[in-house]
Protein backbone atom coordinates (compact mmCIF):
# COMPACT_ATOMS: atom_id res chain seq x y z
CA UNK A 1 0.00 0.00 0.00
CA UNK A 2 2.70 2.45 -1.07
CA UNK A 3 0.33 5.13 -2.31
CA UNK A 4 -1.97 4.94 0.72
CA UNK A 5 0.91 5.81 3.06
CA UNK A 6 1.83 8.80 0.90
CA UNK A 7 -1.77 9.93 0.49
CA UNK A 8 -2.84 9.73 4.13
CA UNK A 9 0.28 11.15 5.79
CA UNK A 10 1.44 13.66 3.17
CA UNK A 11 2.87 16.86 4.67
CA UNK A 12 3.00 20.02 2.52
CA UNK A 13 6.51 21.38 1.93
CA UNK A 14 8.21 18.34 3.47
CA UNK A 15 9.36 16.28 0.47
CA UNK A 16 11.90 14.18 2.38
CA UNK A 17 9.23 13.22 4.94
CA UNK A 18 6.79 12.33 2.16
CA UNK A 19 9.31 10.25 0.20
CA UNK A 20 10.22 8.34 3.36
CA UNK A 21 6.61 7.30 4.00
CA UNK A 22 7.30 4.18 1.91
CA UNK A 23 10.92 3.66 3.03
CA UNK A 24 10.39 0.76 5.48
CA UNK A 25 8.54 -1.24 2.81
CA UNK A 26 10.91 -0.63 -0.09
CA UNK A 27 13.94 -1.31 2.10
CA UNK A 28 12.43 -4.71 2.89
CA UNK A 29 11.55 -5.33 -0.76
CA UNK A 30 14.76 -4.10 -2.40
CA UNK A 31 17.37 -5.14 0.19
CA UNK A 32 15.80 -7.67 2.60
CA UNK A 33 19.02 -8.31 4.52
CA UNK A 34 19.39 -4.57 5.21
CA UNK A 35 15.84 -3.70 6.24
CA UNK A 36 15.88 -3.90 10.06
CA UNK A 37 17.13 -0.41 10.79
CA UNK A 38 16.68 1.70 13.92
CA UNK A 39 14.90 4.70 12.46
CA UNK A 40 14.17 6.13 15.91
CA UNK A 41 17.90 6.34 16.71
CA UNK A 42 18.67 8.19 13.48
CA UNK A 43 15.67 10.47 13.99
CA UNK A 44 17.08 11.44 17.38
CA UNK A 45 20.67 12.09 16.28
CA UNK A 46 19.58 14.29 13.35
CA UNK A 47 17.17 16.39 15.44
CA UNK A 48 17.73 20.03 16.36
CA UNK A 49 20.61 20.65 18.74
CA UNK A 50 22.25 17.27 18.14
CA UNK A 51 25.81 16.91 16.74
CA UNK A 52 24.45 15.46 13.46
CA UNK A 53 21.58 17.91 13.19
CA UNK A 54 20.08 17.83 9.71
CA UNK A 55 16.48 19.00 9.17
CA UNK A 56 16.09 17.20 5.83
CA UNK A 57 17.28 13.85 7.21
CA UNK A 58 15.28 14.40 10.39
CA UNK A 59 12.15 14.81 8.28
CA UNK A 60 13.14 11.65 6.40
CA UNK A 61 13.43 9.55 9.56
CA UNK A 62 10.20 11.03 10.91
CA UNK A 63 8.55 9.80 7.71
CA UNK A 64 9.95 6.30 8.32
CA UNK A 65 8.60 6.29 11.88
CA UNK A 66 5.22 7.59 10.70
CA UNK A 67 4.98 4.65 8.29
CA UNK A 68 5.52 2.18 11.12
CA UNK A 69 3.00 3.91 13.37
CA UNK A 70 0.40 4.09 10.59
CA UNK A 71 0.78 0.36 9.90
CA UNK A 72 0.06 -0.42 13.56
CA UNK A 73 -3.02 1.81 13.54
CA UNK A 74 -4.30 0.52 10.20
CA UNK A 75 -4.25 -3.14 11.18
CA UNK A 76 -6.45 -2.33 14.18
CA UNK A 77 -8.71 0.15 12.39
CA UNK A 78 -12.43 -0.20 11.82
CA UNK A 79 -11.78 0.38 8.11
CA UNK A 80 -9.53 -2.66 7.78
CA UNK A 81 -11.59 -4.87 10.08
CA UNK A 82 -14.85 -4.15 8.26
CA UNK A 83 -13.40 -4.94 4.83
CA UNK A 84 -11.81 -8.08 6.24
CA UNK A 85 -15.06 -9.31 7.79
CA UNK A 86 -17.04 -8.59 4.62
CA UNK A 87 -14.66 -10.68 2.50
CA UNK A 88 -13.46 -13.28 5.00
CA UNK A 89 -15.91 -16.09 4.18
CA UNK A 90 -15.63 -15.42 0.44
CA UNK A 91 -11.84 -15.75 0.54
CA UNK A 92 -11.95 -18.79 2.82
CA UNK A 93 -14.11 -20.47 0.18
CA UNK A 94 -12.30 -19.27 -2.93
CA UNK A 95 -8.64 -19.63 -1.88
CA UNK A 96 -8.72 -23.46 -1.82
CA UNK A 97 -10.81 -23.52 -5.00
CA UNK A 98 -8.36 -21.26 -6.87
CA UNK A 99 -5.33 -22.81 -5.14
CA UNK A 100 -4.31 -19.44 -3.67
CA UNK A 101 -2.13 -20.05 -0.56
CA UNK A 102 -2.17 -18.51 2.90
CA UNK A 103 -5.73 -17.17 3.03
CA UNK A 104 -5.24 -14.70 5.91
CA UNK A 105 -1.98 -13.22 4.63
CA UNK A 106 -3.28 -13.02 1.07
CA UNK A 107 -6.53 -11.27 1.98
CA UNK A 108 -4.59 -8.82 4.14
CA UNK A 109 -2.30 -7.95 1.19
CA UNK A 110 -5.19 -7.70 -1.26
CA UNK A 111 -7.07 -5.27 0.98
CA UNK A 112 -4.01 -3.01 1.06
CA UNK A 113 -3.59 -3.20 -2.73
CA UNK A 114 -7.30 -2.53 -3.28
CA UNK A 115 -7.19 0.57 -1.06
CA UNK A 116 -4.32 1.83 -3.21
CA UNK A 117 -6.38 1.04 -6.30
CA UNK A 118 -9.37 2.98 -4.95
CA UNK A 119 -7.28 6.03 -4.06
CA UNK A 120 -5.54 5.95 -7.45
CA UNK A 121 -8.84 5.74 -9.31
CA UNK A 122 -10.16 8.74 -7.38
CA UNK A 123 -6.98 10.84 -7.07
CA UNK A 124 -4.92 10.03 -10.14
CA UNK A 125 -3.11 13.38 -10.17
CA UNK A 126 -1.79 12.69 -6.65
CA UNK A 127 -0.12 9.52 -7.90
CA UNK A 128 1.96 11.60 -10.29
CA UNK A 129 2.94 13.79 -7.32
CA UNK A 130 3.97 10.62 -5.49
CA UNK A 131 6.40 9.62 -8.23
CA UNK A 132 7.70 13.17 -8.72
CA UNK A 133 8.43 13.37 -4.99
CA UNK A 134 10.34 10.09 -5.04
CA UNK A 135 12.43 11.25 -8.00
CA UNK A 136 13.26 14.53 -6.26
CA UNK A 137 14.53 12.74 -3.13
CA UNK A 138 17.12 10.37 -4.61
CA UNK A 139 20.02 12.08 -2.85
CA UNK A 140 18.12 12.21 0.44
CA UNK A 141 17.68 8.44 0.28
CA UNK A 142 21.35 7.91 -0.54
CA UNK A 143 22.50 10.18 2.30
CA UNK A 144 20.13 8.50 4.76
CA UNK A 145 21.36 5.04 3.76
CA UNK A 146 24.96 6.14 4.20
CA UNK A 147 24.20 7.46 7.69
CA UNK A 148 22.49 4.17 8.60
CA UNK A 149 25.47 2.11 7.41
CA UNK A 150 23.50 0.35 4.68
CA UNK A 151 25.92 -1.83 2.69
CA UNK A 152 23.90 -2.29 -0.53
CA UNK A 153 23.32 1.34 -1.39
CA UNK A 154 23.98 1.12 -5.13
CA UNK A 155 21.70 -1.91 -5.48
CA UNK A 156 18.96 -0.17 -3.49
CA UNK A 157 19.25 3.02 -5.53
CA UNK A 158 19.09 1.07 -8.79
CA UNK A 159 15.82 -0.55 -7.67
CA UNK A 160 14.55 2.78 -6.33
CA UNK A 161 15.17 4.51 -9.66
CA UNK A 162 13.44 1.68 -11.51
CA UNK A 163 10.47 1.95 -9.12
CA UNK A 164 9.76 5.64 -9.73
CA UNK A 165 10.62 5.39 -13.46
CA UNK A 166 8.37 2.42 -14.26
CA UNK A 167 5.43 3.93 -12.32
CA UNK A 168 3.79 0.55 -11.97
CA UNK A 169 1.05 1.75 -9.63
CA UNK A 170 -0.75 3.40 -12.54
CA UNK A 171 -1.64 -0.17 -13.57
CA UNK A 172 -3.75 -0.52 -10.41
CA UNK A 173 -6.58 1.12 -12.36
CA UNK A 174 -6.97 -2.33 -13.94
CA UNK A 175 -8.10 -5.00 -11.45
CA UNK A 176 -6.43 -7.70 -13.52
CA UNK A 177 -3.10 -6.06 -12.66
CA UNK A 178 -4.01 -6.30 -8.98
CA UNK A 179 -4.03 -10.07 -9.40
CA UNK A 180 -0.66 -9.90 -11.12
CA UNK A 181 0.75 -7.78 -8.27
CA UNK A 182 -0.48 -10.32 -5.71
CA UNK A 183 1.16 -13.12 -7.69
CA UNK A 184 4.49 -11.20 -7.66
CA UNK A 185 4.23 -10.69 -3.89
CA UNK A 186 3.70 -14.44 -3.44
CA UNK A 187 6.84 -15.03 -5.50
CA UNK A 188 8.78 -12.57 -3.38
CA UNK A 189 7.85 -14.23 -0.08
CA UNK A 190 8.45 -17.72 -1.50
CA UNK A 191 4.80 -18.79 -1.67
CA UNK A 192 3.37 -20.81 -4.56
CA UNK A 193 2.35 -18.33 -7.27
CA UNK A 194 1.41 -20.84 -9.96
CA UNK A 195 -2.28 -20.20 -9.22
CA UNK A 196 -2.19 -16.95 -11.21
CA UNK A 197 -3.83 -17.13 -14.63
CA UNK A 198 -4.09 -13.86 -16.60
CA UNK A 199 -7.68 -12.77 -17.27
CA UNK A 200 -9.12 -15.78 -15.43
CA UNK A 201 -12.85 -15.21 -14.94
CA UNK A 202 -13.05 -16.65 -11.41
CA UNK A 203 -10.00 -14.76 -10.20
CA UNK A 204 -11.25 -11.51 -11.71
CA UNK A 205 -14.64 -12.02 -10.03
CA UNK A 206 -12.85 -12.32 -6.67
CA UNK A 207 -10.88 -9.11 -7.28
CA UNK A 208 -14.08 -7.28 -8.29
CA UNK A 209 -15.99 -8.50 -5.24
CA UNK A 210 -13.20 -7.38 -2.92
CA UNK A 211 -12.87 -4.01 -4.62
CA UNK A 212 -16.62 -3.42 -4.31
CA UNK A 213 -16.44 -3.93 -0.54
CA UNK A 214 -13.37 -1.68 -0.30
CA UNK A 215 -15.35 1.06 -2.07
CA UNK A 216 -18.29 0.50 0.27
CA UNK A 217 -16.22 0.79 3.43
CA UNK A 218 -14.12 3.72 2.20
CA UNK A 219 -17.33 5.64 1.55
CA UNK A 220 -18.01 5.19 5.27
CA UNK A 221 -14.45 5.99 6.37
CA UNK A 222 -13.15 8.41 3.71
CA UNK A 223 -9.40 8.98 3.49
CA UNK A 224 -8.21 12.50 2.78
CA UNK A 225 -4.95 14.10 1.72
CA UNK A 226 -3.77 17.38 3.21
CA UNK A 227 -3.99 20.30 0.78
CA UNK A 228 -0.83 20.99 -1.23
CA UNK A 229 0.23 24.54 -0.45
What is each stretch, according to the model?
Residues 65, 69-70, 74, 78-79, ...:
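Hydrophobic/aromatic-lined pockets within catalytic cores
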Residues 77, 119-126, 130, 168, ...:
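Long, hydrophobic, amphipathic alpha-helical segments used as structural scaffolds
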Residues 131-219, 223:
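An amphipathic alpha-helical core segment
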Amino acid sequence: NFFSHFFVDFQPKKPSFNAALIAPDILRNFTPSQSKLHFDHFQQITSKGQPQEDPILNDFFNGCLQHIQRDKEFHQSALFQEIYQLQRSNWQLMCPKLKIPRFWFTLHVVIEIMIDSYLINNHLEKLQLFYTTLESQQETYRTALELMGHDQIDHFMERYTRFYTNQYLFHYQDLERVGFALHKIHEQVKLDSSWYIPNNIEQLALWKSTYADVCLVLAKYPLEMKPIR
